[in-house]
Amino acid sequence: MKIDIVTIFPAYLDPLRQSLPGKAIESGLVDVQVHDLRRWTHDVHHSVDDVPYGGGPGMVMKAPVWGEALDEICFDETLLVIPTPAGALFTQATAQCWSTERHLVFACGRYEGIDQRVVDDAVRRMRVEEVSIGDYVLPGGESAAVVMIEAVLRLVAGVLGNPASHRDDSHSPDLGRLLEGPSYTRPPTWRGLDVPPVLLSGDHARIAAWRREASLRRTRKRRPDLSGARFVWGLGLS
């Protein structure tokens, strides 16, 4: 997999060189390149934004600069991702789908966003997804890009040491799109708090049933909106 990130703040993406993403890069499982958008400017001030047509606060990132950058970086098989609070919600299912892509390009906007014509032009040549990581607004797309890239990379074959590690994650298909239940490790008693006895029993069937029930309880309490939870409760299974 190849990932290109275009931004006016390249250092913002440095965390991708750490931990799991960093190991994936070092091992050659993924090639991550960060590009400074200002490289495609042609004026002495390296301007990337201008005032919005129609008036209003803030500045809008200029189409000609973004157009040249994407022309150079993207090709027919590229999936262009534009982080924006006005986008579709990024989910675990999205991450799973993107984990099999050959080439992802993240266009990190700032200010009031990127001129809409950049998107309108790009969709004529490649697949484009405008995506949000939640119902809130960030100063730019870089933080969202890091979140999405980390979520995707841990699902890429070979990145996790144990391929089964993500199967029981919160929101995963194998967990029925529910939240993962609580986890415990040694010691069995700490500050008067005990590990649930069933987890010490060695009875795998009982442990699996306990974890399923704990997952349902947590989901019902914290995220009753999740479709997996609604389906199970609709069947009267909790």
Curated annotation (Swiss-Prot):
InterPro entries: Alpha/beta_knot_MTases (IPR029028), tRNA_m1G_MeTrfase_C_sf (IPR023148), tRNA_m1G_MeTrfase_TrmD (IPR002649), tRNA_m1G_MTases_N (IPR029026), tRNA_MeTrfase_TRMD/TRM10 (IPR016009). Belongs to the RNA methyltransferase TrmD family. Its main location: cytoplasm. Its EC number is 2.1.1.228. Specifically methylates guanosine-37 in various tRNAs. Homodimer. S-adenosyl-L-methionine binds at G109, I133, G134, D135, Y136, V137, L138. It catalyses: guanosine(37) in tRNA + S-adenosyl-L-methionine = N(1)-methylguanosine(37) in tRNA + S-adenosyl-L-homocysteine + H(+). The keyword Cytoplasm applies. It comes from Mycobacterium leprae (strain TN). GO terms for biological process: tRNA N1-guanine methylation. This is tRNA (guanine-N(1)-)-methyltransferase. Keywords: Cytoplasm, Methyltransferase, S-adenosyl-L-methionine, Transferase, tRNA processing. One of its GO terms (molecular function) is tRNA (guanine(37)-N1)-methyltransferase activity. GO terms for cellular component: cytosol. Pfam families: tRNA_m1G_MT. It is found in: Cytoplasm.
